[in-house]
Amino acid sequence: MENQKQYPMTQEGYEKLEQELEELKTVKRPEVVEKIKVARSFGDLSENSEYDAAKDEQGFIEQDIQRIEHMIRNALIIEDNGDNNVVQIGKTVTFIELPGDEEESYQIVGSAEADAFKGKISNESPMAKALIGKGLNDQVRVPLPNGGEMNVKIVEIK
């Protein structure tokens, strides 16, 4: 049996996936089944755009269900070990870009729960890779997408 990719995530991220799966199974799936039923009542399925759209939607929902079930089955819950001296998945890191004093904070999470707009970056991102394993007051070079880099100083880990 081949090794399954594990999906590191916080307990919060795991619970969010479970909620999303529950909604897909108990709300979205029955809704699309009803849409298909209604579209079938229109008759000829060969030229029935409502039926085609509902079947497409059903396919997307089933695909999402399979993807989330796979992630839940292969989830690796990251427990907080209480060590706020080292950056790791689940921790929120505050740093300043050098030179300067403006602070930025991000929580490092598994790719399944990453959301930059909510300040959650994937452990697979270049920034997180550069920060993981580093400690308080460490200066770190973070690679940028344009090929450059920025220097940051870690000022808080929680």
Swiss-Prot record:
Biological process, per Gene Ontology: DNA-templated transcription elongation; regulation of DNA-templated transcription elongation
Matches recorded under InterPro entries: GreA/GreB_C_sf, TF_GreA/GreB_CS, Tscrpt_elong_fac_GreA, Tscrpt_elong_fac_GreA/B, Tscrpt_elong_fac_GreA/B_C, Tscrpt_elong_fac_GreA/B_fam, Tscrpt_elong_fac_GreA/B_N, Tscrpt_elong_fac_GreA/B_N_sf
Source domain of life: Bacteria
Keyword annotations of the record: Coiled coil, DNA-binding, Transcription, Transcription regulation
Coiled-coil regions listed: 2-70
Gene3D superfamilies reported for this sequence: Transcription elongation factor, GreA/GreB, C-terminal domain, Transcription elongation factor, GreA/GreB, N-terminal domain
Pfam families: GreA_GreB (PF01272), GreA_GreB_N (PF03449)
Function: Necessary for efficient RNA polymerase transcription elongation past template-encoded arresting sites. The arresting sites in DNA have the property of trapping a certain fraction of elongating RNA polymerases that pass through, resulting in locked ternary complexes. Cleavage of the nascent transcript by cleavage factors such as GreA or GreB allows the resumption of elongation from the new 3'terminus. GreA releases sequences of 2 to 3 nucleotides.
HAMAP family: GreA_GreB
NCBIfam families reported in the protein's UniProt record: greA, PRK00226.1-2, PRK00226.1-4
Similarity-based family: Belongs to the GreA/GreB family.
Entry protein name: Transcription elongation factor GreA
